[in-house]
Each structure stands twice: as structure tokens, then as C-alpha cells.
Amino acid sequence: MNELELLGPRAYGDALGRAALKATAEDFQVDEVLDIPLSGDGEHLWLWVEKRGLNTVEAARRLARAAGVQLRTVSYAGLKDRQALTRQWFSIQLPGKADPDLSAAQDATLQILKSGRHKRKLQRGAHAANGFTLRLTQLEGDKEALNQRLETIALQGIPNYFGVQRFGYQGGNLGEARDYAGRKALPEQRAVRSRLLSTARSYLFNRVLAARVADGSWQKAQVGDLLAFTDSRSFFPADVDECSDPRLAILDLHPTGPQWGEGPSPAGGATAALENAIANDESVLRDWLVRAGMEHERRILRLPIGRLTWHYPEPDILQLEFVLPPGCFATVLVRELVDLVPVGQTDSPCVF
């Protein structure tokens, strides 16, 4: 499957040119934003780690080996890309133990920048945001048009699609999910099961969002919508009054789409009709998610791009700096600007 089939239409028209992303790790930098002050004592050693050419799980394994502990005692807030320069937190549970010598874990691909003790382990999804610095190289495009589109995006946001990396190479993860769903089976391995269930939910969400981008309603509240704030997992129904809430205009409040689970869509009106129609069209995937015990959740349809700035350090390089909530994909911003020339892979996303 191609990108258009896995995601959906762009919000602002065709790509404005071509560029390469991830020609080097420095072209895709991610800094985890964590608003948790460390207590200075406790059985958990927290580590601020810079890594390149390593995904999060590989880094965790290396830290576990160096510390002489089992992998399950190493925790992290979210998964970060392999083909990137990333800085994120890890914690290691060390009850009654001194800080281990972790020099064996460090080399040109992994450096521990700072450390500290805390009373609790690092929980999945505990980070507040991810900060990105992207360099689009080999740029071919009209800078004036790119600047205008970036200004529009800064004011209006972008569709909050799950990026193609969620679906694997050419949508292979979705093919696997369909195979298991068709057999009414679940993978035995927990990691594989989680990956394929997430893929199926993401695809159903993207289909709903694609339909709303196509009809122009992705950033507008309509009666029957379920609304949510940018950083909240809770939601509430939209009536006539809520549809004119001024917080919609300033990108604090957004319509949401389904993360499918048990029961019909909790939305109402035209929103429920659309979501249930897509779920019925993909009934094999929907029923598979329900049998797996997934709970119905919501995800904002519109993604505000925090602190968006850009400049051109070289005539053929566009550098973007911005902040996204956890679970959102930097590559969907790039997609609204340019087509990518194949260079590096967008491996594993920031999914938590």
C-alpha cells in the first residue's frame, strides 16, 4: 500500500517540491521533554541518554547488560527512531544497589549525558512532549510558497495522521494484522500483538481522518463530535454552543476520531455515522480489536505544531524546529510541505 492509501489526502494541496530527510542522523533530532523533577534518592537510577543509530529498545538492552540487570528493569517513556539523533530518559531499578559502572554501554552511538536517583521508575507516556529539529536537504522548491504554507500550518495545524512508519514497509504491518484478524487469532508474542493491534487501530483512525480532510471538516467542530484538548485523553460531546467555542480557533480544543475498541462510536450525528460506516466497512479489523479487549479511545484530528520556526541555513536546506505531543508524527508535517527523496528510513515513531 502507498502513503495515500495508508494516510489520506494532504490538507493544503500538493507537495511544494522535493527534499531528502535523514541523509544523516543529525538531520532528524528528537529531544524528549519530561516535566518530572528527580528526588535525588530512591532505588531508580534515571539516565539522560543521547543515541544515534539505535532505537530505544536496543539502547535499553545495552544499558541492562552494562548494569548487570534484566531488561524488564529498564524503563523508558516512549519509543524513538533509530535513524536519528535522539535524547531521551531511561530508568533502571536498582534496589539496595549502588550506581553501576555503565561505561561498557557507551560508545559513539550512545552517551549518558546526566543521571540522578528517583523514588519511582519512568512510566510509559510520562513525557510531556517531543522537541524536533529536522533538516530537509537537497531541497527543490519555491521558498516563498513553502514559507506561506508554513505560516498557514503555524496558524491552523495539520491533520494528525499516524505516519507511514506505523504501518511498516509498504504497509506490511497492516497486511499482518489483516491476516490475524481474518483467522480470528492473536500473535503469541506480546510485542508483536501490541504492534499489530496498534496498526489496525491507527488505520481505522486514518480512514476517518482522511474522510474529514476530504470534506473539509477535520479542523471544525460539528454537532455530535467529541472534543478534546491538545494534551488531554478525556473528551466531551459537542452541541451547538461547543461548536463555537473560541478555544477551537486558537488550537487548544479539537474534534477527535476513534481509536477503535469495544462498542459503537460514542460520537453522535454525522460523526457517528461516518465512524460506524468505516468500522462496518472494516468489520474484520474492528471485530478483531473488540475481541482483543481494546477499549474505545479518542485522538485529536487536528495537530497543532508548537513553537514552529524555520530557516534556510543553505540554499538547498530547510531546517524546521517544533514541538509535538507524545504519539504524534513529525513526518506528517514534512508531508504537507514536500515529497521525500528516498534516503533514510523513518523507522520507529515516537508512539508513547
UniProtKB/Swiss-Prot annotation:
Domain TRUD: 157-303
Enzyme nomenclature, EC number: 5.4.99.27
Reaction(s) catalysed (UniProt annotation): uridine(13) in tRNA = pseudouridine(13) in tRNA
One cellular component (GO) term of this entry: cytosol
Pfam family, any one: TruD
CDD domains: PseudoU_synth_EcTruD
One of the GO BP terms on file: tRNA pseudouridine synthesis
GO molecular function, a single term: tRNA pseudouridine(13) synthase activity
Active site: residue positions: D81 (nucleophile)
Keywords assigned: Isomerase, tRNA processing
Gene3D superfamilies: TruD, catalytic domain, TruD, insertion domain
Function: Responsible for synthesis of pseudouridine from uracil-13 in transfer RNAs.
HAMAP family attached to this UniProt entry: TruD (MF_01082)
Membership in a protein family: Belongs to the pseudouridine synthase TruD family.
Name of the protein this chain belongs to: tRNA pseudouridine synthase D
Native source organism of the sequence: Pseudomonas syringae pv. tomato (strain ATCC BAA-871 / DC3000)
